[in-house]
Every structure is written in structure tokens, then in C-alpha cells.
Regions:
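ATP-binding N-terminal substructure of ATP-dependent carboxylate-amine bond-forming enzymes
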Residues: 1-95
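Active-site loop of classical SDR/Rossmann-like NAD(P)-dependent oxidoreductases
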Residues: 98
């Protein structure tokens, strides 16, 4: 399985590191990633708020699961965008409390 991890911090580096230990993972793409993730997976130089560009890379690289690390793309609606494209993702979601 090809997995995409959105973010460029230590959290995303740790996720990539642990995911690579699974025999079910073929390749990991970090969007945009950092120097550390670049050593263990393929970084894709795309801004985390460029949802359309992220989607095109998901399709091009046959990414089957997206993991969203940072809060900013979540607040800006990346989960809604991914749902509309019928893509699998793992992320915290916004909850409305009354």
C-alpha cells in the first residue's frame, strides 16, 4: 500500500518511521516533508493547503491512504475535500459541541 503523510514536522517524521516498519506498506510520500522524512520516504514539494495539487499527486503516485498531521489543513477543510474525492484518510475531525 502507498501512503501519503501530510505535514513537515517531527510528528509526521515519526509517523513515516513507524509506517515503514509495516510489511503492508510499499511506499510513503510525505507532503511536503522535511530533511528527515526525505531520508526515509519520498517528499513531494506541495504546500499543505494546495488541495488540488495534493489530489493530483495522490492519483499520480497511486496513494491509497492519506494521513493528515497538522491542524491547519484540517481547519481549512482537507477532510471534506478528500471525502468528496472518495479517498481514504486518517485525521482528527472537527466536532461541533452544543
Amino acid at each position: 500500500m502507498n501512503i501519503g503523510v501530510i505535514g513537515s514536522g517531527g510528528r509526521e517524521h515519526s509517523l513515516c518511521f513507524k509506517l515503514l516498519q509495516s510489511k503492508k506498506v510499499d511506499k510513503i510520500f510525505c507532503i511536503p516533508g522535511n530533511a528527515g522524512t526525505g531520508e526515509i520516504c519520498k517528499n513531494l514539494d506541495i504546500d499543505i493547503l494546495e488541495f488540488k495539487k495534493i489530489y493530483l499527486s495522490i492519483k499520480k503516485e497511486n496513494i491509497e491512504l492519506i494521513i493528515v498531521g497538522p491542524e491547519i489543513p484540517l481547519v481549512q477543510g482537507i477532510t471534506d475535500f478528500l471525502e468528496k474525492k472518495i479517498l481514504k484518510y486518517l485525521a482528527l475531525v472537527k466536532m461541533h459541541l452544543n
